[in-house]
Amino acid sequence: LEIRMNASTGRIQPDISAESTVSAPPKKTQIIAIYGKGGIGKSFTLANLSFMMAEQGKRVLLIGCDPKSDTTSLLFGGKSCPTIIETSAKKKAAGEVVTIGDVCFKRDGVFAMELGGPEVGRGCGGRGIIHGFELLDKLGFQDWDFDYVLLDFLGDVVCGGFGLPIARDLCQKVIVVASNDLQSLYVANNVCSAVDYFRNLGGNVGVAGMVINKDDGTGEAQAFCDVVGIPILAAIPADDDIRRKSANYEIIGTAASQWGGLFEALGIAVAEAPPVRPKPLTQDGLLGLFKGEAVGRGVELAPASFADMCGVTYVEKPSLEVVYEGA
């Protein structure tokens, strides 16, 4: 599924020719995919960002594209949205048709939905994402009119379904959420590698920048962005007040919050940041951002032997050779 914008109406128009890579005309709607390591704070960032954008008078659609289906829980005070895939299956079994009101919900100007996915061990999450976008098309996605469509994607998985926005130019730009730790920057680097790869194939998606979440001031994420060539859109501090409010499903991306200015600035940065082609790091380059003792750079690879694998002293036994007369 490829989404383009109709130049005359400024609205989203789907093109389900998966192989086409035609450059899209200028778009009114900014479609932005957010990637990051599981648990890094993508949903927290997006819920507060979308709320602030709505306060700024923008029309915002937030779509959770993670099988955990927890993107919208903070926005709705801990309540879970019925997912598109689950609702579609139930409606189909009952001989009914899915309507927008079955799967899309709103709060203070933010519209939100969850694509969902299969139950654990019972299907392919990436395929579920593709199927979810097909269902969105049937719901009239091409006629919806938003200033921003924010897609919350899992970043740990390299499956093509989760890479759909990058591979098929579904979005104009990507934002990565990370922190000052190796694991989250490893995922961010993988996302940058995917963007760079599809740019080589003629794609148009670029990285708009990084949001540093739980920033402890150690600087590894800043160093990563400097080397890869992407800007920092915001640095959300590792603050106990933020942690408590997030745990209590309290929105802080509002002008009434002491953190409102942070998300107001993030909203402006997200809107204005151009998509750029990143320069992903090698594994050694990524490890080089950290102190040697933190990543074990003094360790050498020692080859294992068959005897090691058997766990006992191994004595090679001679084989029985069979000799045939006249051979």
Give residue spans per PLM region:
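Conserved catalytic-core segment of NTP-binding enzymes
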Residues: 55, 138-148, 153-238, 243-244
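Solvent-exposed alpha-helical segments within well-ordered globular domains of core cellular machineries
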Residues: 51, 69, 111, 130, ...
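Helical mechanochemical/support elements of P-loop NTPase systems and associated helical scaffolds
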Residues: 67, 125-128, 132, 158, ...
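Nucleotide-state-sensitive switch-loop elements of NTP-binding domains
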Residues: 29-32, 55, 59, 65-153, ...
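C-terminal lobe/tail of nucleotide-utilizing enzymes
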Residues: 2-26, 197-327
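Extreme N-terminal, non-catalytic leader segments
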Residues: 1-40, 44-59
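Short secondary-structure boundary/capping segments
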Residues: 24, 101-105, 166
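Short acidic, glycine/serine/threonine-rich loops at helix termini
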Residues: 45, 72-75, 162-163, 188, ...
